[in-house]
């Protein structure tokens, strides 16, 4: 199983957030994600450049923006002194105090267009980031995450950690 300690310090890691559907629950505010038009909890998925699942942080309420979850879950401290690739949801997430640098694609200026070089840079950036989308898709193959979690919200974090451990064992079985 690959952990953050196994990833060389000079290798970049890739981060992305996803929503685990839970349905709307009485007494739990902030679960509805306006971006995804669904209620659930958000998780932050970290993988290496080969697509190996390194870490999953969370859960946070589904309405929490990726950049806010990044800081709330302490990923900026755990990934200190590393180059991290993220999407536009992580704009402004670099942390000078820990040395964590989050590279994001170049954003199109209002009323303007990107130059050819910026478009190529974004293309390469997104091609590298595709592995984290694949890692999320592999996680979401587990029925408890794909069909929506229907158990008590107090245990959703435990269920997510269990699924992550099982997925790591599935992709990297222990040598016998």
Give the ranges of each region predicted by the language model.
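Short, well-ordered secondary-structure "scaffold" segments embedded in the functional core
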Residues: 1-176
